[in-house]
Amino acid sequence: MQHTPRRRFGQNFLVDSQTVTDIVHALHPRREDVMVEIGPGLGALTQPLLQSLEHLHVVEIDRDIVKRLRNEFSAKRLTVHEGDALEFDFSSLGESLRVVGNLPYNISTPLLFHLSRFTDHLRDMHFMLQKEVVARMVAKPSTSDYGRLSVMLQCRFEMEQLFIVPPECFHPPPKVQSAVVRMIPLKKPLIEASQEKLFAEIVSAAFSQRRKILRNTLRDYLTGEDYLKLGIDSNLRAENLSITQYVAITNYFNRVRSG
């Protein structure tokens, strides 16, 4: 059955066998692992994973691909969850979950935020993403790539770029390079669960106007005196602050607000 990649689903199918081998090697799957693949496409990664795993879950939104997968693989070995990964409850698959996928570039950032909600259920995640997105994920403070995505993910995950994948490894070839990233949940997230919403608001406000200084972007949260107490220069920009400093701001503001 031929399948034409659909632009609305951001489909760029992995077709390079060496890249598949490299991803499987990075995963080092064990037979008993609980693993879910997001966007399996034509099964380039699905097939070799099943050679190592007793069972695999996949989440796929394209009904033609769902039909293809159900015809090609035994339901005893492969469970196909038809639907949008952005709405999927990954906690329903159990604990110590391993997640892998060649993520559609058009939903990669919201999907990463969605998956961040399930850190208590995750063992690790390995994703193929646009190289520029991976650069932002792993970026350090005071660099051009460091931003909201860096802070929001690094407060929950230890992340590492593993290798680059060129466009010719896909069909159709994307216009950008890709990279594979490994994400391992921190044993203890840097921000308390009760503070996550406030933390996200503060980080978003700080990076809303990158060229403006903190005194302007965080004026709804901090006064000049607050900066002195925190030991933070209010003339810095959002990209100059470390994640621990954003955590400190959040905890401080919450204490002041609570009286």
UniProtKB/Swiss-Prot annotation:
Gene3D superfamilies, per this entry? Answer: Ribosomal RNA adenine dimethylase-like, domain 2 (1.10.8.100), Vaccinia Virus protein VP39 (3.40.50.150)
Range of residues in the leader sequence:
none
Q: Which InterPro entries match?
A: KsgA/Erm (IPR001737), rRNA_Ade_diMease-like_C (IPR023165), rRNA_Ade_Mease_Trfase_CS (IPR020596), rRNA_Ade_methylase_Trfase_N (IPR020598), rRNA_adenine_dimethylase (IPR011530), SAM-dependent_MTases_sf (IPR029063)
Q: Which domain of life is it from?
A: Bacteria
Q: What does the entry list under GO cellular component?
A: cytosol
GO terms for MF: 16S rRNA (adenine(1518)-N(6)/adenine(1519)-N(6))-dimethyltransferase activity; RNA binding
| SMART domains per the UniProt record, alphabetical | rADc
**What are the subcellular locations of this protein?**
Cytoplasm
Q: Name one Pfam family in it.
A: RrnaAD
Q: What class of enzyme is it?
A: transferase
| Keyword annotations of the record | Cytoplasm, Methyltransferase, RNA-binding, rRNA processing, S-adenosyl-L-methionine, Transferase
Give the EC number(s) under which this enzyme is classified.
2.1.1.182
Report residues binding S-adenosyl-L-methionine. N12, L14, G39, E60, D84, N102
Q: What catalytic reaction does the record list?
A: adenosine(1518)/adenosine(1519) in 16S rRNA + 4 S-adenosyl-L-methionine = N(6)-dimethyladenosine(1518)/N(6)-dimethyladenosine(1519) in 16S rRNA + 4 S-adenosyl-L-homocysteine + 4 H(+)
What's the family?
Answer: Belongs to the class I-like SAM-binding methyltransferase superfamily. rRNA adenine N(6)-methyltransferase family. RsmA subfamily.
Q: What does this protein do?
A: Specifically dimethylates two adjacent adenosines (A1518 and A1519) in the loop of a conserved hairpin near the 3'-end of 16S rRNA in the 30S particle. May play a critical role in biogenesis of 30S subunits.
Name the record gives this protein: Ribosomal RNA small subunit methyltransferase A
Gene that produces this protein: rsmA
